[in-house]
Each structure stands twice: as C-alpha cells, then as structure tokens.
Design a protein with these regions (language model features):
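Alpha-helical protein-protein interaction modules
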Residues: 1-105
C-alpha cells in the first residue's frame, strides 16, 4: 500500500496544535503516529517530549527525551528558544516547561 510522504509532517503539526490546545494526550498520540510514519521526523520527537513532560508521566517523558536526543543531538532549551519562535509568549513558556519537566536543561 502506498504511503503519503507528507503524512508524518501532517501528524507532527497536528500534534503540535494539540499541544498548543492543552490536549497533551492527543499530542502524544499524534506525535507517535508521526514517528510511526517517519521515525526520523525530529519535530514529532519534540512534541512527544514536551507533551509527555506536561502530562507528568516520568517514564514516557524520560523515554521521549532520550529519543529526541538521539534524533537531534545537542538539542537544548537554548536551542529551542532560539530556533523555534512562537507567536504567543504563553505558548513558548508552556512548550519550554514541558521540556523542563521531561528533564531537559
């Protein structure tokens, strides 16, 4: 069965939208689907990590952060702040808080 090469990107963006909407479980589901479609899609790893942190699931958050670090070596809060600008400051603060809760420094 042919695959849509953009499905992973769609799911990753949908996961990010769910995160912004405070729907962290849905964000995790969409990020996982994105990663199932394309395991190297770093954006999905980031959404999964931040959403897991906000859910307060230490096992999932630790595993997600480990996967993110494999997919994007050297990723840090400073990199995310610098490279992923967000329109609304409250969204940026919550996104960064998710990474902090997942164990990122």
């Amino acid at each position: 069965m042919p695959r849509d090469p953009l499905a992973a990107i769609y799911c990753g963006v949908a996961g990010y939208a769910q995160f912004i909407g405070h729907n962290y479980e849905e964000a995790v589901q969409m990020a996982r689907e994105s990663m199932r479609q394309r395991g190297d899609f770093v954006g999905a790893h980031r959404v999964l990590t931040a959403a897991a942190g906000m859910l307060g699931d230490p096992i999932l958050a630790s595993s997600a952060l480990e996967g993110l670090r494999r997919a994007q070596p050297g990723v840090s809060l400073a990199w995310i702040t610098r490279e992923l600008p967000m329109l609304r400051e409250e969204d940026r603060a919550r996104y960064l808080e998710g990474f902090r809760r997942a164990g990122m420094e």
